[in-house]
UniProtKB/Swiss-Prot annotation:
Species whose genome carries this gene: Bacillus pumilus (strain SAFR-032)
Domain of life, per lineage: Bacteria
Stated family: Belongs to the UPF0473 family.
Name of the protein in question: UPF0473 protein BPUM_2377
HAMAP family: UPF0473
Pfam families the record matches: DUF1292
InterPro entries: UPF0473 (IPR009711)
Amino acid sequence: MEHGEKQITIVDDNGNEQLCEVLFTFESDHFNKSYVLYYPISEQDNEEIEIHASSFTPNENGEDGELEPIETDEEWDMIEETLNTFLDQEEEDEE
């Protein structure tokens, strides 16, 4: 996982692979982490899509970091705020 990547493959607890589209990545100085927001490509034609979020730490080369679950409500609140800002900006750009 690296910043700027467009698609990632997520492996669930059962070992099933799912190709996902990266919505965007961002860094938080407050939590000292990078985050990725993504959704399954199989849902992209649906009227509503479920957006997933994970944190990641790029390896020494700055690429292919491991995805980690979001750990705290404070992180979730920050991610929601960032997502809402992103979506508001997208709506403005469409007008």
